[in-house]
Amino acid sequence: MNWLDEVSWDEKGLIPVIAQEASSGDVLMFAWMNREALQKTAELGQAVYYSRSRGRLWHKGEESGHLQTVHEIRLDCDNDVVLLKVTQLGHEPGIACHTGRHSCFFHLYKDGQWVVTEPVLKDPGSIYK
């Protein structure tokens, strides 16, 4: 059996993916992959996702330069979630989020409201031209 056949794809042929920084354990982002994206990620050693809004493959960093080198690809116990252990690269290393932050998970629920916990490391307007 092909390793991709062991993945439990959803009804749209997608699987949720979490990117985790290998060195710190920080959760950087959540995205989706289709079969082709997962195959390309394994082949290239760089994260390639499937953009549901664009309806196409999205090589992380193709516009921003913030590539992700993939060290491990893991599948959870139900075969329906992928975990990528990555090193976040780029002109400004450590920026994974399109908002210019280290992580996409920068909102913290505290005392009945969402609080921004991470600074913008670089203005997204200067990243995406």
Curated annotation (Swiss-Prot):
PANTHER family: HISTIDINE BIOSYNTHESIS BIFUNCTIONAL PROTEIN (PTHR42945), HISTIDINE BIOSYNTHESIS BIFUNCTIONAL PROTEIN HIS7 (PTHR42945:SF1). Catalyzes the hydrolysis of the adenine ring of phosphoribosyl-AMP. Binds 1 Mg(2+) ion per subunit. Gene3D superfamilies: Phosphoribosyl-AMP cyclohydrolase. Homodimer. It is found in: Cytoplasm. GO terms for cellular component: cytoplasm. It comes from Polaromonas sp. (strain JS666 / ATCC BAA-500). Pathway: Amino-acid biosynthesis; L-histidine biosynthesis; L-histidine from 5-phospho-alpha-D-ribose 1-diphosphate: step 3/9. Keywords: Amino-acid biosynthesis, Cytoplasm, Histidine biosynthesis, Hydrolase, Magnesium, Metal-binding, Zinc. This is Phosphoribosyl-AMP cyclohydrolase. It comes from the Bacteria. Its main location: cytoplasm. HAMAP family: HisI. Its cofactor is Mg(2+); Zn(2+). The keyword Iron does not apply. It catalyses: 1-(5-phospho-beta-D-ribosyl)-5'-AMP + H2O = 1-(5-phospho-beta-D-ribosyl)-5-[(5-phospho-beta-D-ribosylamino)methylideneamino]imidazole-4-carboxamide. GO terms for biological process: L-histidine biosynthetic process.
